[in-house]
A protein has these predicted regions:
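Hydrophobic targeting/anchoring helices
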Residues: 101-253
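Polysaccharide-binding and catalytic clefts of secreted carbohydrate-active enzymes
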Residues: 1-169
Length: 253
């Protein structure tokens, strides 16, 4: 189990020190993936300290009032914004001073639409104000877009419609900024309990939805190929690797 960390100043310093090793090894870009808090979090001692520093008042549990809930959510966004700002600025300076290299810094993140559905707090709206962030990966796939929602009183999965809205929200992060956005295209999702026909059905819908936003033309295709090509998914189709050997390969030309 990987614990969720409160991004304190000391944590940002730890990340910076560890990532300098990657810069020394010659990496050209760093991705800080999914900076996020669960909405129900905010009760650790580290978070309480950050609350009292930020608001200059005693910590209040977020479940006690709407005001406390808002303050905790605002602080969660601030903490990750501060961390990304500090880490990216420090590493870019390190790469420039020591190696005369321009290091790039990207943030892979879900859409705010999905974060709302899954009750996750993200600093996404704040990322545009961090000058050392070079772009984003819109992490939208079947797992986020199949999340059921209500339309005209009917609650059901609407993968294509939801994906279209998610990609549309994400492109706003780079409009007029000169930054780059990649749209994620993943043939499967994290749950291995669906049939391959179901994965393919929904993959086609998310892929088409991503193509309907012409201002974005960079894509991350099949981010976890081992889940597609080594036969682990779905669990109850042991010969799936043979079945999909060429189904989702990209053209070689």
């Amino acid at each position: 189990t990987v614990p969720y960390m409160v991004p304190t100043v000391s944590f940002s310093e730890y990340l910076t020190d560890r990532l300098k090793v990657a810069v020394d090894a010659g990496v050209e870009a760093i991705h800080v993936e999914e900076p996020e808090f669960w909405d129900k979090s905010g009760y650790s001692e580290a978070f309480k300290r950050e609350y009292e520093i930020y608001y200059k008042e005693p910590w209040k549990p977020q479940h006690e009032s709407l005001d406390a809930q808002y303050k905790c959510a605002r602080l969660k966004a601030y903490l990750y914004k501060r961390t990304i700002d500090r880490v990216s600025a420090a590493l870019k300076e390190y790469a420039k001073v020591k190696y005369q290299k321009d290091l790039r810094f990207y943030v892979p993140t879900h859409s705010l639409l999905n974060y709302t559905q899954w009750k996750i707090m993200s600093p996404e709206a704040e990322l545009i104000s961090i000058p050392t962030v070079d772009g984003y990966i819109a992490q939208i796939w079947t797992g986020t877009s199949r999340e059921a929602n209500v339309y005209e009183g009917v609650y059901k999965e609407r993968t294509f419609e939801t994906a279209y809205l998610e990609y549309g929200v994400m492109q706003e992060l780079v409009k007029g900024t000169g930054r780059r956005m990649w749209f994620l295209n993943d043939p499967i999702e994290d749950l291995p309990s669906y049939t391959w026909e179901n994965y393919e059905y929904n993959y086609r819908r998310t892929a088409v939805a991503s193509l309907l936003h012409p201002h974005i033309w960079h894509y991350e295709i099949c981010p976890w190929p081992h889940r597609v090509f080594d036969g682990r998914y779905p669990r109850f189709q042991p010969r799936i690797a043979e079945k999909i050997e060429t189904s989702f390969e990209t053209d070689q030309s």
